[in-house]
């Protein structure tokens, strides 16, 4: 069905829940002659088989609550320091904790840390730059940042750390 309408649509939204789904979707698109942009969720990070369909793989863009730039100088410095101090490698979960702690410490800086003051400062939309994602809340209580990632020539690359809302 998609092949019959592929010349009238811009792309296809294909979220996955298992890394092996990526290869199945990509190969089916190639076999069916469907040459569309693919939009998905962060589970595409776990995908396998990108190399079997490079032209189609290069059309993949997805959102994610994390993106780690392993080539970033600040990340490399932090990772080395963390390994030397804690004796373990930095991973995604460690970065979630580190970025959250950095956010909380930034929130309570320069205020009397009462519940009310903390709430107001969080709702003010203060932005904190993190290694896995930027963090900013308002009175909706959800992080306003989402990473937009694409797969290009065998590498996942950050397109933007997009901030929604006001």
What is each residue range found by the language model?
Residues 1-166:
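Extracytosolic ligand-binding ectodomains
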């Amino acid at each position: 069905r998609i092949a019959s309408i592929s010349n009238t649509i811009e792309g296809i939204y294909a979220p996955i829940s298992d890394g092996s789904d990526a290869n199945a979707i990509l190969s089916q698109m190639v076999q069916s002659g469907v040459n569309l942009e693919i939009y998905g969720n962060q589970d595409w990070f776990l995908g396998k088989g990108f190399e079997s369909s490079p032209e189609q793989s290069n059309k993949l863009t997805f959102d994610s609550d994390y993106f780690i730039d392993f080539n970033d100088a600040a990340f490399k410095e932090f990772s080395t320091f963390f390994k030397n101090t804690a004796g373990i490698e930095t991973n995604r979960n460690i970065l979630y904790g580190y970025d959250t702690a950095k956010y909380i410490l930034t929130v309570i800086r320069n205020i009397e840390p009462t519940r009310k003051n903390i709430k107001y400062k969080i709702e003010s939309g203060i932005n904190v730059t993190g290694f896995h994602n930027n963090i900013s809340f308002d009175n909706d209580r959800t992080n306003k940042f989402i990473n937009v990632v694409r797969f290009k020539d065998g590498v996942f690359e950050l397109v933007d750390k997009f901030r929604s809302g006001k």
